[in-house]
């Protein structure tokens, strides 16, 4: 994630880009949730070129699954980042990625993740079925989720995502 381990940070880069003539819009994608701080959001909300669209990778709405994925945030911390964006931007489009069927994901964990996706009201959710990749820690984990269960979970989240998106489009001010 740009800005976490580098001397230059993302906010400084955005401010510099904002000053460039000919650049009309700035849109951020695939943000690490830890970058979203009150100072960061407050500052970019003042920039006329900033598009109110933010893609924050969630991966899972269940803390136990996030921990197995070695993510460095909790669902609650992620939700707070979304709240900050909504505090400073009028009707921002929040999009995300969710992985279903990560090793060890139980029905209860999936239900927790699904409820979280429902709660956040994403504009769009990209759903991916976990695929085993040799040489990774996850490939060696016990409790690999069967493909048919991943397919069912994926279909459930896709249906939820489409329903939520339709509601947001229907109720959003023009």
What are these regions, as identified by a protein language model?
Residues 167:
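Conserved functional hotspot residues or short segments at active or partner-binding sites
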Residues 104-117:
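Catalytic cores of alpha/beta
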Residues 170-174:
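Conserved small/polar residues in nucleotide/adenosyl-binding loops
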């Amino acid at each position: 994630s740009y800005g976490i381990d580098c001397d230059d940070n993302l906010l400084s880069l955005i401010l510099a880009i904002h000053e460039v003539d000919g650049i009309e819009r700035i849109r951020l994608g695939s943000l690490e949730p830890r970058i979203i701080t009150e100072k960061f959001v407050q500052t970019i909300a003042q920039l006329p070129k900033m598009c109110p669209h933010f893609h924050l990778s969630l991966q899972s709405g269940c803390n136990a699954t996030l921990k197995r994925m070695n993510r460095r945030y909790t669902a609650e911390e992620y939700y707070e980042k979304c709240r900050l964006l909504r505090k400073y931007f009028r009707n921002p489009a929040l999009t995300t990625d969710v992985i279903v069927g990560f090793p060890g994901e139980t029905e209860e964990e999936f239900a927790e993740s699904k409820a979280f996706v429902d709660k956040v009201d994403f504009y769009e959710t990209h759903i991916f079925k976990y695929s085993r990749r040799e040489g990774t820690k996850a490939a060696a984990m016990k409790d690999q989720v069967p493909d048919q269960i991943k397919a069912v979970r994926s279909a459930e989240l896709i249906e939820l995502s489409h329903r939520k998106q339709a509601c947001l489009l229907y109720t959003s001010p023009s």
